[in-house]
Amino acid sequence: MASGGFPRCRAAYARIPPDMQIVEKGQLMSAAEIDRTLQRVAHEIVEKSGGTKHLALIGIRRRGVPLAQRIAQAMRGIDGVEVPVGILDITLYRDDLSKVAPQAVLQSSDIKFGVDGMDLVLVDDVLYTGRTIRAAMNGLFDLGRPKRVSLCVLIDRGHREMPIEAQFVGRTVQTSDTEIVEVRLREIDNEERVMLVDRKE
């Protein structure tokens, strides 16, 4: 399903103006810590869902997709079941680097299974204002009527503008409005870590 004609979403740090200085403040998670966190989260999801029979993961492009795939792989190691993984592509319209304009639009979906009656878990890398998640949930309910929709994020950085809460969180980080949580994954970035950076005018 596609809304058509919209540019793909880019990470905030990819849209940094050339005159803006970025200062790395520290590493939040190493590659090993990311792997351990995803293993823990996989166990938490299976336990809370009462198994994997009606469970499916929906990764939000871009970095939510490899995270969802890794969690599904960890679940396969828990009970030997192949948990299906779908993809949602959300376009964000930004009016500056720190605030998202009122529009967050579902651009496309790649979900090859029915969602009716399913226990769905949305997976994203960073939870910030909540606008992306709201658009993702709207898109899911356009596809059908899942039994339950939960949210799993690697990092919750606060500053919510929507009444959105993650049920499964890798790590909660207190941030300022000028700071950016930068997630890098080997499938996309050829390196693996989570950093906290600050932008200076």
Residue ranges and their predicted role:
Residues 1-201:
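PRPP-associated nucleotide enzymes
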